[in-house]
């Protein structure tokens, strides 16, 4: 009798262990795997200065950050490793928009109320040329083709500058152009128009306007992911981001973000998008694979925005104000988007093991006793 009880207890113990192991595996699958939605972002630094920060450009290879000082006549150079200002470059009155050719190391600065585009050699810190340009505002640079695109809402023009000659070689008619971005992989240029609620698409190889795309209310920021050929546009008065398929020039999704989204950047390596929500005092974090907001990072009055994809540091300012905020975001693991299959598999394995053990015990119970 005691021997039979021991056998039964042993079988129950085996069943319990199988269930426990299955449950433990599932638990660790849920708790230990990296999560794309877990916030690991940290506001690591704030740099304050009285001249009023403007727009930001980043060199991901030298880790230098260039920020215009709108209330002054300078561009501040920040060490992206230490987050400390290194130097200032004299450029002229009311510097606002800024763009960098990461190959030639030429910096382009829009002196908005000085009707000038300043071109600076970042190696020497010297201005090599000033180009007369009425009310220049936003700048996008294609480092591969050495072309520079500059918007001017006062003239309703986008000007194209040849970086090899530093001359304006073409202009494009765009009603109230605002934000501008280049997809270096496809050589396509995207320009937002706040007053018409459209995005204008320019083909860089032929220098012609190919189409316009209807988007949300008051579009401003725009960015392209060269790896996925996807374009993202912030709609300030709609509180949304429109997602555009670059191969079709069609809006394929609309994402709700915070209040008054201004600018937008993407880390193409992680396929993560960041949006500055000025009134919400936050950065929305979007997963480019699912087009879902996966996080919100608290930041005071974010407006202008730039990212170093190598360090995943995000830089944001509120134009004309005194604070440059630096956010260090974790590198989010995109493989976690497929981990649901792993979870289901582990659950299934644990359940099957428990069921098999149960039936083995039941079968043993149903066998007739053997008499010796």
Predicted regions and their residues:
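Core hydrophobic alpha-helical transmembrane segments of single-pass membrane proteins
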Residues: 18-22, 347-356
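Polybasic, lysine/arginine-rich low-complexity segments
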Residues: 7, 11-12, 206, 365-367
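N-terminal Lys/Arg-rich, disordered targeting/topogenic segments
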Residues: 1-5, 368-371
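Hydrophobic secretory-pathway targeting helix
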Residues: 2-35
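C-terminal membrane-anchoring or membrane-association module
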Residues: 355-372
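Predominantly soluble domains enriched in secretory-pathway, periplasmic, or organellar proteins
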Residues: 28-338, 372
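Juxtamembrane/start-of-transmembrane alpha-helix segments at the extracytoplasmic/lumenal side
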Residues: 334-348
């Amino acid at each position: 009798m005691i021997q039979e009880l021991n056998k039964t207890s042993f079988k129950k113990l085996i069943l319990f262990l199988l269930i426990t192991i299955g449950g433990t595996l599932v638990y660790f699958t849920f708790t230990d795997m990296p999560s794309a939605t877990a916030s690991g972002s940290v506001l690591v630094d704030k740099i304050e200065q009285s001249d009023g920060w403007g727009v930001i450009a980043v060199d991901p290879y030298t880790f230098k950050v260039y920020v215009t000082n709108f209330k002054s006549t300078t561009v501040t150079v920040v060490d992206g490793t230490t987050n400390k200002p290194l130097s200032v470059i004299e450029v002229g009155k009311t510097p606002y928009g800024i763009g960098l050719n990461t190959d030639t190391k030429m910096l382009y600065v829009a002196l908005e109320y000085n009707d000038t585009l300043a071109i600076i050699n970042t190696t020497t810190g010297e201005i090599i040329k000033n180009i007369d340009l009425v009310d220049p505002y936003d700048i996008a640079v294609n480092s591969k083709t050495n072309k520079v695109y500059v918007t001017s809402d006062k003239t309703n023009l986008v000007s194209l500058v040849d970086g090899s000659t530093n001359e304006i070689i073409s202009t494009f008619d765009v009603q109230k152009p605002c934000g501008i971005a280049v997809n270096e992989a496809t050589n396509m240029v995207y320009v937002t128009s706040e007053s018409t609620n459209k995005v204008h698409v320019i083909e860089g190889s032929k220098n012609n306007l190919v189409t316009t795309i209807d988007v949300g209310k008051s579009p401003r920021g725009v960015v392209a992911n060269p790896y996925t050929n996807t374009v993202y546009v912030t709609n300030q008065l709609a509180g949304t981001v429109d997602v555009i398929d670059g191969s079709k020039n069609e809006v394929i999704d609309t994402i709700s973000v915070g209040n008054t989204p201004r600018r937008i950047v993407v880390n193409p390596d992680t396929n993560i998008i960041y949006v500055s929500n000025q009134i919400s005092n936050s950065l929305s974090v979007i997963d480019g694979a699912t087009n879902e907001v996966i996080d919100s990072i608290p930041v005071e009055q974010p407006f202008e925005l730039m990212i170093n994809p190598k360090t995943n540091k995000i830089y944001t300012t509120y134009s004309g104000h005194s604070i440059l905020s630096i956010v260090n975001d974790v590198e989010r693991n995109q493989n976690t988007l497929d981990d649901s299959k792993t979870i289901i598999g582990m659950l299934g394995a644990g359940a099957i093991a428990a069921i098999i053990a149960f039936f083995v015990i039941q079968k043993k119970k149903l066998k007739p006793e053997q008499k010796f």
